[in-house]
């Protein structure tokens, strides 16, 4: 199951990601995190004993067994050290695989040798040639995008980090040679490379992931230097932040949400928590994290929304909640959030109170800081986004999409309303490079729909027209997102209840090119101009020049290899 996706723009990833190093400082940090988890487990055990009673022999025996297990460090238990001497591990190329050390466990070239004839045991490391080959395999080029996909399989969750290479050159000799081609290294060498999508590395997550947000800020640094991190929100109330430029990392770089205060040690039991009704907790979330939004203007600020009905603004330097807002959505779940594209003080949120809120976080009085626009009474807002600096889009649990103009007074009727799906909206995306392009998906349906909607005239109430509807064989659709760079302006990823991730270039479809002809031409002209400024040639500027382009979808199969699906004739059965 792919439950959330996001993109990393070109140029932010380290070209050669570093390998995880288990030094003394890292060991101390891990020990602190492990102790918190152990305290959590002990508190859970005490709670279970208190509820079950000591008179139940079966429950007592089970509790004693659990207590004995707690004496074994969780990090060591997976290695089965108690039965280590009883196991026979096959000798592989003169040594055994190293599994004791997180920084070495995933390296098949690192071997442990017992030693012969009284010699001391030792570890053999890869030679310089092997290291260079591995370094090249991990290389991320400046022209590559990363795709972040939150995946759950067999009750275990991961964040998969994909590399998307849009390719180079053109197979067709009809594509004209243009000024600036000689300055592009790939084109100058005559290199022709097809698009490719593959898994670079992955991270194991503590709970089912609900959202993922890319950060260009180095957490805990107080630095303006660009970085490459990901924040993951799950059914747990904490937010984990990981460095995407580090491979084989065992623990996150930062956890937002006061893990100690938010652990079972301090929140003894759910019953006591409900009875006490402590009110607004300002330091951390107490329920699932439903959405996050990184502020591109104030880069040390991350907003999060939760099923605990609050919106929190996090300081990424200290890891603390700088502000907590509890009354924006009338004590209802806050499901979605996004910062304004031009104003870093304005936060857009949607909630289960049927309202969209536009909040100025600089205002201290919560009763005066938000303006509201409402969907139909009883509908729950599932997702919100800016289509432009003045137009808001929101999707609801009944399958409706609403458009509001923030220049109108609050509580005004929507500019238009669209019955997009018969089930609740799970994903709603607006393409920031192609004005008026919108994609939708529903958690109870298997199709992704592409729409064209009026954007330049706020008085146009005609509403969107569907360009196409397509089943990508991902099961019920849970997530989709458009690429963040102009060179891949028409590319989107799609995920659903099936574990495969699909990548689709929408402009390889003839109907899409026809519907957005002028918008595509404008993007191509702009991309060409931007490429020439940096001495390169634009690939998108010369794409889609003929009408016989195959409709292309890239699929990642079970082995993590990409397969390219091509629909002949540039048509598709599900076309509108």
From Swiss-Prot:
GO biological process: rRNA processing
Pfam family, one: WD40
PANTHER family on file: PERIODIC TRYPTOPHAN PROTEIN 1, PERIODIC TRYPTOPHAN PROTEIN 1 HOMOLOG
A GO CC term attached to the entry: cytoplasm
Entry-linked InterPro entries: PWP1, WD40/YVTN_repeat-like_dom_sf, WD40_repeat_CS, WD40_repeat_dom_sf, WD40_rpt
Keyword vocabulary terms for this entry: Phosphoprotein, Repeat, WD repeat
Basic and acidic residues: compositionally biased ranges: 108-120
Lineage per the UniProt record: Eukaryota, Fungi, Dikarya, Ascomycota, Saccharomycotina
Further details from the record: Present with 43800 molecules/cell in log phase SD medium.
Name assigned to this protein: Periodic tryptophan protein 1
Modified residues (Phosphoserine): 52, 131
């Amino acid at each position: 199951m792919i439950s959330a996706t996001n993109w990393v723009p070109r140029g932010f990833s380290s070209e050669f990601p570093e390998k995880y190093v288990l030094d003394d400082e890292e060991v101390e940090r891990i020990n602190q995190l492990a102790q918190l988890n152990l305290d959590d487990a002990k508190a859970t055990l005490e709670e279970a004993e208190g509820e079950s009673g000591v008179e139940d022999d079966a429950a007592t025996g089970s509790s004693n067994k659990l207590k004995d297990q707690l004496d074994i460090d969780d990090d060591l238990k997976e290695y089965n050290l108690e039965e280590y001497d009883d196991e026979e591990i096959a000798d592989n190329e003169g040594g055994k695989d190293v599994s004791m050390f997180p920084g070495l466990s995933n390296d098949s070239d690192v071997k442990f040798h017992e030693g012969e004839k009284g010699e001391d045991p030792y570890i053999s490391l890869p030679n310089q040639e092997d290291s260079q080959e591995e370094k090249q395999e991990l290389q991320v080029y400046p022209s590559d995008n990363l795709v972040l996909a939150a995946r759950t399989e067999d009750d275990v969750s991961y964040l998969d980090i994909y590399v998307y290479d849009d390719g180079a050159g053109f197979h067709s000799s009809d594509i004209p040679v243009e000024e600036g081609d000689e300055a592009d290294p790939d084109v100058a060498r005559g290199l022709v490379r097809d698009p490719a999508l593959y898994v670079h590395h992955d991270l194991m997550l503590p709970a089912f992931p609900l959202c993922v947000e890319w950060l260009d800020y180095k957490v805990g640094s107080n630095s303006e230097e660009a970085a490459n991190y990901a924040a993951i929100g799950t059914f747990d109330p904490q937010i984990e932040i990981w460095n995407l430029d580090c491979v084989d990392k065992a623990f996150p770089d930062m956890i937002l949400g006061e893990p100690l205060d938010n652990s079972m040690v301090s929140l003894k039991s759910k019953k006591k928590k409900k009875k006490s009704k402590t009110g607004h907790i300002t330091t951390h979330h107490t329920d699932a994290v439903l959405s996050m939004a990184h502020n591109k203007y104030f880069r040390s600020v991350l907003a999060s929304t939760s099923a605990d009905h609050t919106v929190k603004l996090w300081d990424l330097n200290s890891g603390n909640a700088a502000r907590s807002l509890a009354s924006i959505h009338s004590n209802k779940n806050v499901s979605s959030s996004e910062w304004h594209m031009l104003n870093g003080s304005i936060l857009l949120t949607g909630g289960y109170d049927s309202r969209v809120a536009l909040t100025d976080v600089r205002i201290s009085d919560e009763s005066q800081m938000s303006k509201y626009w409402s969907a139909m009474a009883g509908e729950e807002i599932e997702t919100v986004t800016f289509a432009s600096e003045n137009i808001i889009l929101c999707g609801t649990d009944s399958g409706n999409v609403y458009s509001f103009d923030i220049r109108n007074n609050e509580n005004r009727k929507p500019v238009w309303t669209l019955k997009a799906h018969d089930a609740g909206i799970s994903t709603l995306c607006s393409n920031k490079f192609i004005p008026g392009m919108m994609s939708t998906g529903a958690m109870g349906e298997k199709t992704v729909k592409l729409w064209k909607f009026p954007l330049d005239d706020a008085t146009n109430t005609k509403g969107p027209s569907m360009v196409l509807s397509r089943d990508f064989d991902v099961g019920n659709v849970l997530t989709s997102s458009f690429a963040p760079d102009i060179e891949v302006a028409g590319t989107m990823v799609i995920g659903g209840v099936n574990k495969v991730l699909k990548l689709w270039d929408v402009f390889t479809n003839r109907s899409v090119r026809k519907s957005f002809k002028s918008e595509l031409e404008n993007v191509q002209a702009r991309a060409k101009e931007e490429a020439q400024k940096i001495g390169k040639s634009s690939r998108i500027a010369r794409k889609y020049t003929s009408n016989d382009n195959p409709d292309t979808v890239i699929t990642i199969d079970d082995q993590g290899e990409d397969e390219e699906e091509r629909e002949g004739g540039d048509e598709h059965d599900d076309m509108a």
